[in-house]
Amino acid sequence: VIFPDTSDMKLVENVEDVVRRFGGSFKVSVGGSWRSIVESWLSSGGIVVHLTMYGIPLPKVIDEIRSSGKDLMVVVGGAKVPREVYSLATYNVSVTNQPHSEIAALAVFLDYYHQGKEFYFNFENAKIKVVPSPSGKKVIFTSRGSD
């Protein structure tokens, strides 16, 4: 996760806290120019997917994105995304043609990308695992949770 153009260390702390508790290999950083980050990603051979309500509908392009075999950067912008993002992105992808939240766009994209398999992911080093339940919250604290 990269939060460019900011130095808010609280963002880093929040993501790192989630990773400590729920596991996974997420990395987070703040700062730097968004343009430099995107251009560097592209020059290293990766692809950039920009989630917007103005792009190609997700169902029409997801197979192509998934089968590219390239490292993927997902850009989730808000209402004030610079125009250059649209021209730099490998794909401008719409999750709907109506206004939506950035986190909703990312969630919908990831669900399509992983084809629903994210419900069965097991993240290494998880201290907490969520157990599906028809009512209420159920979690398991793993042996790593006593660190």
What does each model-identified segment do?
Residues 33-39, 56-57, 99-102:
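A short acidic, often aromatic-flanked loop/helix-cap motif at beta-alpha or helix-coil junctions
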Residues 20-22, 47-48, 67-71, 93-96, ...:
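Short, low-complexity, polar/charged sequence segments that are solvent-exposed and flexible
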Residues 6-9, 80, 99-101:
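Gly/Ser/Thr-rich loops at beta-strand to alpha-helix junctions
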